[in-house]
């Protein structure tokens, strides 16, 4: 039976030797009156002078042009039920009174960028300017890159890669599509 007792290990608290007492230093008392103890005492006194009775630090000073704000009041959580589950949701806080209740932040930004508000009919349309005509452009063109002026837009007469002539009524989108296809099929580097 004694063998089974020895095989079981049990933990027990050690007792301190009789000659040694545990130190009982509290935060306010320091062992000797040396220079180190005086420095620590002064540090503790300075730090505790900033504490309130509750142990909280005093509020930080307000920045210039910043009025102190009260803590935002949180609206009560709303509940909604889906099937047998009930969910809680805290709604967003209401906008501050200075921003206006109905207009969003993007409206304020857009009106500030525009510098004006109102409907577009109140303002004159901007002046439309066309592209320069072919006569105003210096012509250093090769025959394959000959351009004509149609409605103020410059168009190519032929493809610079495969030399195919474009039909006179061909839309710019069709010309761009042909050029893209030629570029995709081409393995040569073309300098424009």
From Swiss-Prot:
Bias kind Basic and acidic residues: ranges: 66-76
Zn-finger segments (UBZ2-type): 156-192
Main location, first listed in the record: nucleus
Protein's cellular compartments: Nucleus; Chromosome
Pfam families xrefs: FANCA_interact (PF15751), UBZ_FAAP20 (PF15750)
PTM sites of type Phosphoserine: 119, 149
Biased composition regions of type Low complexity, renumbered to the chain: 132-149
Note on domains (UniProt): The UBZ2-type zinc finger binds both 'Lys-48'- and 'Lys-63'-linked polyubiquitin with preference for 'Lys-63'-linked polyubiquitin.
Organism of origin: Bos taurus
Gene Ontology CC: chromosome; Fanconi anaemia nuclear complex
GO-annotated molecular function: K63-linked polyubiquitin modification-dependent protein binding; polyubiquitin modification-dependent protein binding; ubiquitin binding; ubiquitin-modified protein reader activity; zinc ion binding
Signal peptide, first to last residue: none
Superkingdom as given in the UniProt entry: Eukaryota
Record text on subunit structure and interactions: Component of the Fanconi anemia (FA) complex. Interacts with FANCA; interaction is direct. Interacts with REV1.
Annotated Basic residues bias: 1-16
UniProt keyword terms in alphabetical order: Chromosome, DNA damage, DNA repair, Metal-binding, Nucleus, Phosphoprotein, Zinc, Zinc-finger
Binding site for Zn(2+): 159, 162, 178, 182
Region Disordered, residue ranges: 1-34, 51-151
Any one of the GO BP annotations: interstrand cross-link repair
Keyword DNA repair: yes
Function: Component of the Fanconi anemia (FA) complex required to recruit the FA complex to DNA interstrand cross-links (ICLs) and promote ICLs repair. Following DNA damage recognizes and binds 'Lys-63'-linked ubiquitin generated by RNF8 at ICLs and recruits other components of the FA complex. Promotes translesion synthesis via interaction with REV1.
Protein name: Fanconi anemia core complex-associated protein 20
